[in-house]
A protein has these predicted regions:
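Enzymes that bind and transform nitrogen-containing heteroaromatic metabolites
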Residues: 3-227
């Protein structure tokens, strides 16, 4: 039992998501970013990784001013649950999302007491959920979100490390890939961290179910085909 999991990704035409420094604002257009707000608005929770929090300090909220008019005029937009995968409990208690209304849940594989106390005081709920490799147990985390928080749609907005881990675990049901008409070169970061792929036979097949223009960008909807 787990939510339907949708991964939102932004990339250049040559498949890059950020500069080597981590700079990624903005690859895609404002139209694409408005479209992402619709994905957030329909999601019960938004998940990211500690690396994204440290690099970007995201709000992880639905920004109503950026929604299309028909959604912006809705009586109320419920803010999604914020979820952070933080293996080493490195997220600062001063993170911007912890100053905003709504709940934040942090899954960790670290039993360090001091950062947990600080994050608890900041209003987050820290859940210790390690697997055998001393990383966060991602399937168990998704199951807990469904059973304890009644999350039925989970949106992932994160970097290549967590995106790759979720894909390798068979936990991504759908990808929304926003492709910008720019080239970023080879000294940049890719979409997924998939270290075990050494030959073409080990590729991850996808089914493309929709492609459409969003402003100057293209939105590709794809579903992984798991063996």
């Amino acid at each position: 039992n787990r939510p339907y999991i949708r991964s939102k990704l932004g990339m250049s035409l040559d498949g890059r998501t950020a500069m080597a420094s981590g700079e990624s604002k903005w690859i895609t257009s404002q139209d694409a970013r408005r479209d992402v707000q619709c994905l957030r608005a329909r999601s019960s929770a938004i998940m990211t990784g500690a690396g994204t929090v440290l690099a970007d300090d995201p709000q992880m909220t639905v920004r109503e001013a950026e929604l299309p008019c028909e959604l912006e005029a809705a009586p109320s937009i419920k803010q999604p649950l914020r979820v952070v995968i933080d293996t080493h409990l490195s997220m600062p208690a001063e993170a911007r999302m912890l100053t905003l209304p709504g709940e934040t849940v942090i899954f960790t594989a670290s039993d360090s007491k001091s950062p947990k106390v600080m994050l608890d005081k900041a209003g987050a709920r820290v859940i210790y959920l390690p697997n055998r490799e001393r990383e966060v147990d991602l399937p168990a985390a998704c199951q807990l979100l469904a059973e304890e928080y009644e999350v039925n749609e989970l949106l992932i907005e994160t970097g290549a490390t967590l995106s790759g881990a979720m894909l390798r675990a068979g936990l991504i049901d759908e990808m929304k890939i926003y492709m910008a008409p720019i080239l970023m070169g080879n000294k940049t970061r890719g979409l997924f961290d998939l270290p075990n792929i050494e030959c073409l036979d080990q590729h991850f097949p996808l089914e493309i179910v929709d492609i459409r223009a969003v402003g100057r960008d293209w939105r590709i909807t794809a579903q992984p085909i798991y063996a």
